[in-house]
């Protein structure tokens, strides 16, 4: 950026009717807001009907704005702009802005549109972008607050000017002592020389340190190369224990396979054993339930027979005590041997073996039927309950024979 370019740019913008005053100090530092406003104004001046977004809040928006301006000027005015310099928004952007302003300025001069330009200036004063004005308003408020703070500090400093003037006058009027000044200068020179010597020592140390580091690096490289060769040698040589290791590994794999097979067999056999125990338990419970049902049926049958026997005994005379005892012994001997033969009839694995022993003659049967008393019935009930609890395959069952019709009961007398 040159002073002449900046001056020409400000004069051209003033001649073109730019509403704001552009100072040569505006481009000392990057000022993207001013550059974007100038570019938008120049584009509107070149093509009033164009529509270019003026949002420059984010970095992406600024890049899009610069690209849109450059594309518009390249297609409409055949002016090639450097987008990088425009994005810098400093003195280098002025050269790119001059490309546009020079075209518009030359066109204004050649066609002699001074009068119309004055009218356009008046119109352009009222045509402004509201967004840019809001940004200017924020900047103006910030500047107003800064001006207030600086004005207060300036007022305080001006209040101290009287005292400071006297001190300043005394300092200026006081003669300088040459010896003291030389002493201070010598001290300063010594300090500078010490700093220079220290810097030189550091540079020398840097050179020696660099040589030492290079030697260490070279040594490390040699060690690395040596270790790499050693590693390759070790990898290429087969260890002596590898054959034995592979053999042991194969044996271990075989033992593991055998272990897996035996473990599966053991698990299967345990499952079968559990199933067998469960089936036995179910059979036992079924037999117990069947025995309980048969016991209940036998009790009901005995009660019914006792009731019918008591009714029949009312018509029959009781014989002598010794005969009744002998007949009682014969009746006990004539009972069935086992009770499981009746209870386990539904089970296919059990065979029912038993015999019903009757009397030797009709006379014995008649006497047996007539001599049943209540004591014998109670003993039979007790024996049946004891045998049902034992659940042994050979326990006797008490089957009660129904009394035959007493056709010859009158002949006993």
Curated annotation (Swiss-Prot):
GO terms for cellular component: actin cytoskeleton; centrosome; ciliary base; ciliary tip; cilium; intraciliary transport particle A; intraciliary transport particle B; nucleoplasm. Keywords: Cell projection, Cilium, Cilium biogenesis/degradation, Coiled coil, Nucleus, Phosphoprotein. Residues 185-308 form a coiled coil. One of its GO terms (biological process) is intraciliary transport. The modification Phosphoserine is found at residues 314, 324, 326, 409. The keyword Phosphoprotein applies. The keyword Coiled coil applies. Its main location: other. It is found in: Cell projection, Cilium; Nucleus. Residues 312-328, 360-388 have a biased composition (Acidic residues). Disruption phenotype: E9.5 embryos are still viable but die thereafter. Mutant embryos are runted, have exhibit enlarged pericardial sacs, and defects in neural tube development. There is a complete absence of cilia in E9.5 embryos. Sonic hedgehog (SHH) signaling is severely disrupted with down-regulation of PTCH1 and GLI1. Expressed in all tissues tested including heart, kidney, skeletal muscle, eye, liver, ovary, oviduct, testes, lung and brain. Elevated levels in multiciliated cells such as the bronchioles of the lungs, ependymal cells of the brain and cells with a single primary cilia of heart and kidney. Residues 303-413 are annotated as: Disordered. Required for cilia biogenesis. Appears to function within the multiple intraflagellar transport complex B (IFT-B). Key regulator of hedgehog signaling. Interacts with CLU/clusterin. Interacts with UBXN10; the interaction is direct. Belongs to the CLUAP1 family. This is Clusterin-associated protein 1. It comes from Mus musculus.
